[in-house]
Amino acid sequence: MSEQFEHISVLLHESVDGLAIKPDGIYIDGTFGRGGHSRLILSHLGENGRLYGIDRDPQAIAEAQTIDDPRFSIIHGPFSGMAQYMEERDLIGRVDGVLLDLGVSSPQLDDAERGFSFMRDGPLDMRMDPTSGISAAEWLAEAEADDIAWVLKEFGEERFAKRIARGIVEHRENPDKKPLTRTKELAALISDVSPFRDKHKHPATRSFQAIRIYINSELDEIETALNGAVKVLAPQGRLSVISFHSLEDRMVKRFIRKNSKGPEVPAGFPLTEDQIKALGSADLKMASKAIKPSKDELGDNKRARSSVLRLAERL
């Protein structure tokens, strides 16, 4: 059994304050994790309030089951299923706030057995839900060099993607080499084939991020979850999203911007005002500028340094 690891919720108060919680409201914590955000949300709710937590990590589900509160329910599944879960509960268009804390959590990173970190030796797994899908080791044992390079470039913005992919495949095809099954083995290989050293960043940082994102379909999950949030939110309901790297943040920023605009009609196009309105209207409005951690929080938690909070309101 994995040991317990501390998790410090990033932008905790800012993200929960951004929900503008109503005591009798209905809320979703789409990334329960170890429950930091959920517990704070519950502290703001009255006896008629309701909170649904969602997570696909069995360890998160075990933690959620320690919360003995009739206002709280946990759902085991990906947050991309948010709209479906709420439809099953007849809550489409009735939710007052959705919080998403994207990416991998500190306990997942710190637990070597999960295989997320190049800093700790463990099985090369990287699955958010270890009970489903293929592991990173299984994928790397089969994927073509071009496919590996594409993943490293697309999801890690890795400048040496082709060189690293070629190194992985050459290692795999060498009969004198053991298959890559451990995080330290992959990290060492990447270090060996990378020609450039950044004193502030391990050579494997971007590759591990990219492989993790691919294995868990993270960006597709985020896109589906954001669309699901728009569907489940009531008018004036709040969306609070914390991201940790530029790919996530760009996606969230573009989503809010896109859904804050009405239909684009070319200038001079022969439509009446009523016809334009019939095409639809904006779904969201930005509720705040991007929020970053305070100096105090950065001093207490170095993992907060890349985090960004974006808030939107349902129209």
UniProtKB/Swiss-Prot annotation:
A Pfam match: Methyltransf_5
EC number annotated for this UniProt entry: 2.1.1.199
Class of the enzyme per the UniProt entry, highest EC level: transferase
Binding site for S-adenosyl-L-methionine: 35-37, 55, 79, 101, 108
One GO cellular component term: cytoplasm
Domain of life: Bacteria
Subcellular location: Cytoplasm
Biological processes annotated in GO: rRNA base methylation
GO MF annotation: an example: rRNA (cytosine-N4-)-methyltransferase activity
Primary site of residence: cytoplasm
InterPro entries for this protein: RsmH, SAM-dep_MeTrfase_MraW_recog, SAM-dependent_MTases_sf
Keywords: Cytoplasm, Methyltransferase, rRNA processing, S-adenosyl-L-methionine, Transferase
Keyword Cell cycle among record annotations: no
Cited Gene3D superfamilies: Putative methyltransferase TM0872, insert domain (1.10.150.170), Vaccinia Virus protein VP39 (3.40.50.150)
Catalytic activity reported: cytidine(1402) in 16S rRNA + S-adenosyl-L-methionine = N(4)-methylcytidine(1402) in 16S rRNA + S-adenosyl-L-homocysteine + H(+)
Matching HAMAP family: 16SrRNA_methyltr_H
NCBIfam families: 16S rRNA (cytosine(1402)-N(4))-methyltransferase RsmH
PANTHER family: 12S RRNA N4-METHYLCYTIDINE METHYLTRANSFERASE (PTHR11265:SF0), S-ADENOSYL-METHYLTRANSFERASE MRAW (PTHR11265)
Family: Belongs to the methyltransferase superfamily. RsmH family.
Function: Specifically methylates the N4 position of cytidine in position 1402 (C1402) of 16S rRNA.
Protein's name in the database: Ribosomal RNA small subunit methyltransferase H
Organism from which the protein derives: Photobacterium profundum (strain SS9)
Name of the gene: rsmH
